[in-house]
Amino acid sequence: MTAYETLWDFAEDHYGIVTTSQAVAMGVDKHQLPAMAKRGTLIKKGYGVYLVKHHIPKENDVFAHSVALAGETAYLRGASVVALLKLAPTNPGIVYLGATSRVRRRLPANLRLVDMRPCNCVQYEGIRSQPIDEALRTALDEGAIEADRIADAAVKAHDEGWLTEAEMNKFIRAVS
C-alpha cells in the first residue's frame, strides 16, 4: 500500500483530515506530507494539518477541521457542540473551541479559542468535544445562544439520550 493510500484510508474516517503526528504513527515519513501537498494530492490546511484532496465534503467537516487546526489538545465547546448535535440554531460562522494546553498557532478569524481549560472530553460524531451538559452551560454563560433556545436544546438533548431528566430540568430552571 502506498503512503497516499494509507493516508486516504485513515482520513476518510476522520473527515478527510490527517495530521503529521497521525501520519508518522501510521508509518508515513513526515517529509512525504509536504511533498504530497506540492504534488496536489494533499491540501495543507494549517501547521501539520492536511486534507486529502479527493475527500467528499460532509456536513460536520467544519467542526473536525477546526479542532484539527487548533492542535492535539483542542476540543469543540459551547455553542459549537450544540450545533454539531443539531440541538438548536447557532451562528454557523463561528466555531467555539477549547484546548487543555496553550495554543500558539495563528487560527482563522472565525475560530474562537479559549486555551488552558481542563475538559472531560467526549467524542460526538468522531469529534473531540465538551460534554453536552457542560457545552449548554458554557453557551448560556457566554451568551452564545439565547436562554429559551438553551431550554429547547436541553429538552431535545434529553429526548435523544444525551441528558438525564435531572440535567434537563436544571437547564429549564436556570433559564426560567
Locations of the language-model features?
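Short gly/ser-rich loop at a beta-strand->alpha-helix junction or flexible surface loop bordering the NTP-binding
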Residues: 2-4, 12-21, 29-176
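The alpha-helix within a helix-turn-helix
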Residues: 24
